[in-house]
């Protein structure tokens, strides 16, 4: 029975996370880019002005809302995860350095997709009976499309509830325990025999922390993420930039390999990665599933923002993809390629390849800092996905289930820390990909609304400046 379920899941998983999904996500990104006249490029300086230029202004959010900065930090908390460390390494190992180039291309289109998702989420959001803003794909499907499309909203929410326990929680907890166990073992603090006890303690501590944060509602979630996300991002960026600076003489060669490898991977990898398509597939998929543009999840957090301007919040979506993929994923790639660590092309690789890039430059002592970075990335992801799950289950059953859900979600951290539930997490990953289907249909059908909102936003700004 389990073998049959696993076989079915593998077929669906390969389809959802394979070429068809990439074609759909890239296709919708292209449609949105053309319809907005490549707004993500034309208005990029404006996007940075209304995001970076305003994010450190002290502002109190209204009751039941987050500040725009807290909203983007919560979205980044869920988006910037261990995939930024392990996923990029895997893309390079299988697709060669050229995969990085295609990752950039997917991010360029993903900026417009994420912009559209966030804009629609804020425009079509509602207030629940607790006075909180709620929004996301299920709400812009319900409030933006005709009634015969509403089943897609319930489908998205159901997929989301299933996904959060695996992709958003247990797999991230497993990453935390692995990182801590590895660091403690390397320093001789624990033996492998005592790891199970340590993991149980880690799981309990994480469960308590999660309960304290999530049960405090969106106010507390926003207060935590606005402090944690800038710290962890800056911490990782400084570590990675150090590697790049110390290997600055390799940077021109690395960028040459990235561009050449995008179109002729065999010339860069010694013939091991011979397929142009494989390089493109790995780069595009890493970009898409790192920044989550097309999945619609990030828009759930942005819908909580205390703002009256959907388009202005939409530019935080562009900023989010830029930070996640163009900055953090690119720095991870440069750490691996500039440090010249041995790469076995054609074979799967993960976080260990990225960590090797750090240790080759700094020495073994840095493994403790990379463990801290991985723990921060994973923990922030759990927090962000906790909010997503709460909003999805609330859409299905109402606000009365929020606190029970948050409590159960927190307890799952103990399960993730102590048990190996590989098949269950693989199924959750499949449902994560399935979330993209109803979202992409909705964003495509509502692309005209996005164009209209953008035009109205800039017409209003022009009149205000006149």
Regions found by a protein language model. Name each.
Residues 4-5, 35-40, 83-88, 166-176, ...:
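Transmembrane helix-loop junctions in multi-pass membrane proteins
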Residues 59-94, 120-144, 155-161, 273-322:
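Alpha-helical membrane segments and immediately flanking helix-loop junctions
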Residues 115-127, 241-257, 265-271, 304-307, ...:
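Extracellular/periplasmic helix-exit of transmembrane alpha-helices
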Residues 31-33, 106-131, 138, 142-174, ...:
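Helix-loop-helix module between adjacent transmembrane segments
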Residues 1-82, 92-99, 110, 245, ...:
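N-terminal alpha-helical transmembrane segments of multi-pass membrane transport
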Residues 216, 223-226, 231-298, 303, ...:
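Membrane-embedded translocation segments of transport machinery
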Residues 38-66, 90-100, 104, 112-147, ...:
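Flexible loop linkers connecting adjacent transmembrane helices
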């Amino acid at each position: 029975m389990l073998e049959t379920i696993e076989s079915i899941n593998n077929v669906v998983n390969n389809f959802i996370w394979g070429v068809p999904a990439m074609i759909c996500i890239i296709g919708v990104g292209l449609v949105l880019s053309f319809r907005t006249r490549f707004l993500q490029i034309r208005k990029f300086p404006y996007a940075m002005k209304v995001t970076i230029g305003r994010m450190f202004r002290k502002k109190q959010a209204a009751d039941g809302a987050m500040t725009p900065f807290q909203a983007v930090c919560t979205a980044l908390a869920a988006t910037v995860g261990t995939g930024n460390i392990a996923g990029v390494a895997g893309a390079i190992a299988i697709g060669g350095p050229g995969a990085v180039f295609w990752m950039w291309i997917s991010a360029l289109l993903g900026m417009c997709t994420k912009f559209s998702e966030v804009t629609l989420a804020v425009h079509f959001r509602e207030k629940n009976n607790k006075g909180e803003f709620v929004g996301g794909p299920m709400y812009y499907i319900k409030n933006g499309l005709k009634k015969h499309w509403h089943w897609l909203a319930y489908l998205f929410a159901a997929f989301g509830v299933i996904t959060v326990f695996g992709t958003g929680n247990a797999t991230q907890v497993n990453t935390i325990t692995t990182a801590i166990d590895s660091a403690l073992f390397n320093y001789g603090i624990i033996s492998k025999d005592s790891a199970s006890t340590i993991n149980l303690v880690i799981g309990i501590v994480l469960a308590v922390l999660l309960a304290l944060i999530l049960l405090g509602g969106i106010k507390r979630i926003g207060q935590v993420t606005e402090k944690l996300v800038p710290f962890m991002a800056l911490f990782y960026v400084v570590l990675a930039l150090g590697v790049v600076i110390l290997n600055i003489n390799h940077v021109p060669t690395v960028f040459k390999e990235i561009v050449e490898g995008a179109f002729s991977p065999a010339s860069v990898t010694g013939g091991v990665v011979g397929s142009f398509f494989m390089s493109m597939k790995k780069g595009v998929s890493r970009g898409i599933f790192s920044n989550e543009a097309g999945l619609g999840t990030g828009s759930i957090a942005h819908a909580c923002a205390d703002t009256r301007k959907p388009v202005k919040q939409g530019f935080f979506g562009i900023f989010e993809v830029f930070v996640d993929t163009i900055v953090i994923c690119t720095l991870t790639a440069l750490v691996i390629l500039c440090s010249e660590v041995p790469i076995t092309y054609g074979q799967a690789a993960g976080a260990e390849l990225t960590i090797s890039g750090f240790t080759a430059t700094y020495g073994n002592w840095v493994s403790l800092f990379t463990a801290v970075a991985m723990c921060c990335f994973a923990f922030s992801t759990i927090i962000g996905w906790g909010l997503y799950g709460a909003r999805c289950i609330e859409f299905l059953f109402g606000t009365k289930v929020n606190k029970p859900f948050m409590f159960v979600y927190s307890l799952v951290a103990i399960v993730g820390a102590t048990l190996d539930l590989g098949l269950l997490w693989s199924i959750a990953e499949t449902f994560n990909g399935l979330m993209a289907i109803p979202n992409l249909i909705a964003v495509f059908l509502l692309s005209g609304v996005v164009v209209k909102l953008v035009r109205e936003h800039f017409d209003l700004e022009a009149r205000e400046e006149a």
